[in-house]
Amino acid sequence: IDACLVGSEMCIRDSIETYPYWQKIVEELRNDYDTVNLCTMFETNDVHPDIIDKMKLFDEVIVPYDYLKDILLKHGVKCKALNYWTSSLIRSKPKVIHKTRDPSKLVFLYNGTNDIRKNVTTLTRIFANVLENTEHILIVKTNKPDNLTITKNIRVITERISDEQLASLFNLCDYCVTCTRGEGVGLLHLEGYYFNKPIISHKQGVFKQLGVDIIPLPSNEVDIDYTHVPKFLKNVFYGKWWDIDENNSIKVIKKIISE
């Protein structure tokens, strides 16, 4: 938990997964502070009623974008949006190095976790199809290689790297790409934008409000399949999210590498 004190107002920044502890946190903080606010985010198109009830314990909930704010307002949560977000990489102000694109050797980059929401399995499956018999490369910087399709055109990096090394990957790539099903802040988009890289993704949810140009992948709003969602996240992933249309996304990537 991160906390910020302004006068008699306390604001905590906490991930939505910790909502079962919010009531105790608020009760303890109200012994010392007149106002207790929460800064958080969520990645789907709705919020579970149990989490809404916990949010209403705070005086105000602060979220990154209007898309999230509007959902909470419909549930009666007092809320405001920053319409801004950043990352430690961006805050470090790394040097942006211009790269001249080689159309015969394009480099695509995904930076993020490998889990059911991020949908990296579909991402690597698409690129294994599209990049076969080419010299183009997809770099996947992630936490684990589980169930990923790996070919000579797909490089998976799972070790921890510094912000300086991560900046080198962004400077090396020609495009940033993700097949994520849901997103609360859009870090890949914001970091790609910082490095002047085109972003390939769907355009749903918060992505509509990031202020970055997106090469759109076709997608559909779908019910969440909880088969591979850990038990502690089943209330966190609530409502619907967005699934990439795999066959039509293959066509989009093929068009990019043929231009």
Please tell me what each predicted stretch does.
Residues 142-168, 175:
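Nucleotide-activated donor-binding/catalytic signature segment of Leloir-type glycosyltransferases, i.e.
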Residues 181:
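Aromatic "clamp/platform" in nucleotide-sugar-dependent glycosyltransferases that forms part
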Residues 99-118, 124-127, 139, 237-238:
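Conserved donor-binding/catalytic core segment of Leloir-type glycosyltransferases
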Residues 198-201, 216:
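Short hydrophobic beta-strand element within catalytic cores of glycosyltransferases
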Residues 78, 82-93, 221-223:
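Short beta-strand->alpha-helix junction loop in the catalytic core
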Residues 1-12:
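Single conserved hydrophobic/aromatic residue that forms the stacking wall/gate
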